[in-house]
Amino acid sequence: MKFSKEIEVFNPPLASSASSGPWVHSVFAFTHSWPRKTLFKRDSAVTHRLYGDISRDFQGTSENGVIFQKCAVVSVQSEWPSAHVRLFVNNTRTPTAANLSDLFLLDNITGLTIRESAGNQTSRGFQAFRKKFLQVGDSFSVSYTASLEARDVGSGDILLLPAQLSFQSSSPNRTQLKAPFTITAEEKITVLPNHGLHAAGFCVAFILSLVLTWAVLFFMVRYQCVKGSSLTRHQVQHHENKLEHSQFTSADGVNEDLALNDQMIDILSSEDPGSMLQALEELEIATLNRADSDLEACRTQISKDIIALLLKNLTSSGQLSPQVERRMGAVFKKQFLLLEKEIQEEYDRKMVALTAECDLETRKKTESQYQREMAAMEEAEEVLKRVSERSAVECSSLLRTLHGLEQEHLRRSLALQQEEDLAKAHRQLAIFQRNELHNIFFTQIKSAIFKGELKPEAAKMLLQDYSKIQESVEELMDFFQASKRYHLSKRFGHREYLVQNIQSSETRMQGLLSTASAQLTLLIQKHERAGYLDEDQMQVLLERAQTEVFSIKQKLDNDLKQEKKKLHQKLIIKRRREMLQKHKEQRREQLSIAEASGAAEDAGQYLGQWRGLMAEHSAALEELQERLDQAALDELRALTLSLSEKATEELRRLQNSGMTQELLKRGVPWLFLQQILEEHSRDLAARAERLEGEERDRGQEGVQSVRQRLKDDALEASTEEQAELRHWEHLIFTKLCSSAFSLSEEELLGMRQEVHGCFAQMDRSLALPKIRARVLLQRFQTAWREAEFLKLDQAMTAPELQPQSKARKPRSKSRSKIDLLKKCTEDKIQLFKEQAPEDLVEKVRGELLRERVQQLEAQEGLFAESLVSLQFQKAARMARTLWAYTALLSIQDLLLEELNSSETLTKSACMQILESHSPELQELERKLEDQLAHQEAAQLQRALDSWQQWAGEGPALLQEPEETDSERHVSAVLQRALSKGQKLLEYHQQSLREEQEDSVVLEDLLENMETDTFVTLYGQELRLASYLSKLTMLPGGTLRRLLTVALPAASQAELLAVLDSVGQKHQDHSVENDGSRVQADLGRRGKHQGWWQALESKLRGELINRGLEKMLWAQKRKESILKKTCPPLRERVIFSGKRSWPHLSLESTDELTPVPIVGAEAVDLLNTGEKLFIFRNPKEPEISLHVPPRKKKKNFLNAKKAAWALGLN
């Protein structure tokens, strides 16, 4: 049999940790013949902590330079593995070192067999050592031999055997150091080979494998075809439907939900109660993000089902062929697949970009923070050079603590900022996906109209249904979101209550244990003060009491850790099983609803099914979550209380029996001892009652907090607020849309799509507002803290200039800089621990409200800008054409005047030229009037049809079976009329919107007709101008200068286009009138040379005179407007009418935020820059059979005749 020895040697730096020492740490393997267990010592840094009246914690090397270590060397030379353990204490020579007294060393030896030890062993697995005094620079060590039998531990077991050292130094408090010591058992089994057994096993295994191989081959051949065909069908079906219900059938989403729910068990069973609320807040953010993703997936699925349902209804009504429906359905599926791929790629790009940007920002701010710290340390070092070494060490320690807090604050700020950036990226992708879904639908409808697969009337009806259903979808999603927000708020409010409950239980447990242990020490001290014990006896009893108390607490910690670990696994398994079952049930129901959309006849019915299903699912899931959370808390709390009560009972038993017997052995009077025990029993009962009362009070505060949270996120209030906001925005967008003068069908379609896009992003996501609130609160707290830091720095720089507090003594002017620096640093550290002012929360709420209002206003502004831009572009195109036409008429007038004055043409010849165009002008005017009359008659017929439809359907809404003998006939009719009033109003509003849309479309059609007619007229005028320029022998350069004067705003390209048109028309005119005119000779060219030069100045003068006349008229008009009485300005702009700006839940209670309304009519008062927004109460809509009067436009043909008449006269 061989013995192996494994050795690992660690040489840690001596100056970085308290675990460094003068001798090398060695790790040997315990070995035994068979089975063989190997024990490894895992070395870790010594942690330092204080107990009792603690002033601060130590980390790394202790403040007074004391080093405490527990080390071992393993030996394998004996039958059972053994180790030589050494406890080492070194009081090193440092500037802050001091002599140590009353050293008490407590060593955990649970599971070990101790040999050759000088310590006092207890029955609970501890041994104690004492030393009266340890001088600076001295050290002492304790050694003993321990063995571990293989049957005492199992493979993989870990033994935690720390040692503790407490002592008294120059500090008024006792200091306690802890040296961790870990043993891990590994079992190595050596198997002795048996060749006969191996041969028999090989034969049996060979025969069994042969039989199984033939059986598998037989079944593979038998079912190969069936399996192949079914697999092919499954792959095809999966390829077609992988996107249809992926959000509901995917196991990843369920697994993520289960993982998030498991974290609640981790939080409740955490060993650090102080970090529970922070972990719960992070869990809430992650859950809100997951809920946003689920809602977005639900919205996408509903939108796809709605599109398919609309196409099916269109096919069933005979307005769309089944072949076209299938083709459009296939195109929609393909577009949806491409959209999902595009979104995934965009998501990956955003994540990479955001990660790189956040890393760069982190490096920059970390470097900046490091430079500030180095500058502060250098500045402090200049001050510390002139002070004692002890003060310098204390000040440096404070500065390092402050810098650590600043770094932690910076890390949290960067993490919150990165979290906000990710949430905004998710929101942008969600908005992009919604808009792209609308874009896909509208694009396919336009394509179907263009290809002739869908009639315009059917497309118009389809778009109206789509718009109406989208309003219902947005209302449904608002309900889903409000319901989810309410249920999640309720869930995490309850969880916060549970966390506070378990923290209260932990506080109660620790309080009882501390009271019981303090009573044990107090019992001994009272006897010593009464004179029944001398100092040596008291020290021995105190040592034993401290050993027993530490043993009980250590056992409690170990039992809690082990039992919580077992219970944690049990709770996770139970929770996952029930949650997975609930998710499967709800997923089947969701799939059934999605499949039923193909059989649904009405979209409202389909949306109603979704509403009921989601409400039921949310309530059931939250009920299950709450029940599981409460059950987990009850079990964990019962476990904690049972173990703590057991530990407390052991401490009482130790006091009443063990310590009592020891005191009685030393001759303590029984009556005195009994009196003290009864007093302690009463104090412990009173302490327990007081802790229970505090726990009840905290529980009541938690209940009130949960109620207030549910009140803030009430489902009905949130839904009503969102509905009111959408109604308000609907009024604004309707008002903006009605302001359009003319729109084509395509432009109207684009405007509808843009309105849908605006309404699609009017909701509030679940996670982003909360994340944004955390970022704002962190930012405001940072600003507040920096302002306080600035005050402290100013006070340190010039302390005599700062006002003194009445509660404090005035600082002495002779106080040194080091005292001021220490005081300033301590105050800054305290600021990190203090709570920020409560008004910052209200400030955050106000900022969130302002940002939301700005977002809504930005949507309104963008829509109004696009609408105004569209109208301006149309007006600009018409204006450019009018300018060109007017310039052409001006040039014609000049040419005719010069031809007449130069006697090149007689007056009758000019009349003949003008009259030659009169038949063509009259024909154009007749055609235009016929087209206008036809379109207006068509619109009147549509208005009549709409009125007849409303007259037939509107009163029918009120027609119900009546009771002939009813005594309340009138009241019944009125009640029915009131109940149906909303439907009538909606129907009337819909008909009014349709009438307005028809009006603007008709106006655009008439404008196009007039434009076409005007283009034809413009072509004729070009021919006439070309002919006149031919007669006057006008050079091209002169004509270009004339056009430049007449069209000063025209570009060179536009001028060249007019010149080319004049030249081309001149050629056409010369061909048509070949022989009618005689070519001018060189003498006539010289004759006209003189007035060619004066022509430009004459045209410029006429244009200047016209401009002056227009300016004069505009000035008089402005003066007449300013003379009118204007209403006074108001501080807040109010939209007149029954409704005003809706109240938002985040609105601050201190002051109202003025909300300007985009798209209002603004009037400049007295040219001072002040704006008066005027809103008029809309009159009640009236049903009219007449076509709305069109704006009177100037007839260009009549204007042309008048211009000619004026020119001839």
UniProtKB/Swiss-Prot annotation:
Sequence ranges of Basic and acidic residues compositional bias: 689-700
Sites carrying sugar chains: N120
Extracellular compartment spans: 1-200
Residue intervals passing through the bilayer: 201-221
Coiled coil: 355-394, 553-697, 920-1012
Membrane topology: Single-pass type I membrane protein
One of the GO biological process terms: smoothened signaling pathway
Pfam families registered for this protein in UniProt: EVC2_like (PF12297)
Compartments where located: Cell membrane; Cytoplasm, Cytoskeleton, Cilium basal body; Cell projection, Cilium; Cell projection, Cilium membrane
Gene Ontology CC: ciliary membrane; cytoplasm; cytoskeleton; nucleus; plasma membrane protein complex
UniProt topological domain (Cytoplasmic) ranges: 222-1209
UniProt keyword list: Cell membrane, Cell projection, Coiled coil, Cytoplasm, Cytoskeleton, Dwarfism, Glycoprotein, Membrane, Nucleus, Transmembrane, Transmembrane helix
Signal sequence extent: none
Main localization of the protein described in the UniProt heading: membrane
Region named Disordered: 689-714
Known partners and oligomeric status: Component of the EvC complex composed of EFCAB7, IQCE, EVC2 and EVC; built from two subcomplexes, EVC2:EVC and EFCAB7:IQCE. Interacts with EVC. Interacts (via N-terminal end) with EFCAB7. Interacts (via N-terminal end) with IQCE.
Pathology linked to this chain's protein: Defects in EVC2 are the cause of bovine chondrodysplastic dwarfism (BCD). BCD is an autosomal recessive disorder characterized by short limbs, joint abnormalities and ateliosis.
Function: Component of the EvC complex that positively regulates ciliary Hedgehog (Hh) signaling. Plays a critical role in bone formation and skeletal development. May be involved in early embryonic morphogenesis.
Protein name: Limbin
